[in-house]
Amino acid sequence: YGRRRHPKKLTPLAYKQFIPNVAEKTLGASGRYEGKITRNSERFKELTPNYNPDIIFKDEENTVMNQWPGVKLRVTEGWDEDGHHFEESLHYEGRAVDITTSDRDKSKYGTLSRLAVEAGF
């Protein structure tokens, strides 16, 4: 009690590495598939939109900013309805998100993935 944990060294995730080490749609990673959410469904009302053009992503801990000053987290895909994902994709339920950095520097993606895991995604 009362002691701060020392920050652990974050190791970047490897390309195609998952945490937990299972695919996105397995029970251990995300729970049961609950069904696609459409604009006309009741569950659509439960999704939280973000219309502010000045906000790229809520990052209360400023983890991306602390790691790379001046760089923001960029959400490229969240809830989706266009049908280009696999049939039971969590994007259709609003439970999956694709992210990158505002500078689109691919060398940061491994560390970005680790930050997402540490944040509970």
From Swiss-Prot:
Positions of Ca(2+) 2 binding: E61, E77, D80, D82
Domain of life: Eukaryota
Residues holding Ca(2+) 1: E60, E61, T76, E77
BP term (GO), one: cell fate specification
Stretches of the chain forming a coiled coil according to its record: none
Role, per record: Intercellular signal essential for a variety of patterning events during development. Signal produced by the notochord that induces somite patterning, dorso-ventral patterning of the brain and early patterning of the developing eyes. Displays floor plate-inducing activity. Binds to the patched (PTC) receptor, which functions in association with smoothened (SMO), to activate the transcription of target genes. In the absence of SHH, PTC represses the constitutive signaling activity of SMO.
Similarity comment text for this entry: Belongs to the hedgehog family.
Protein's name in the database: Sonic hedgehog protein
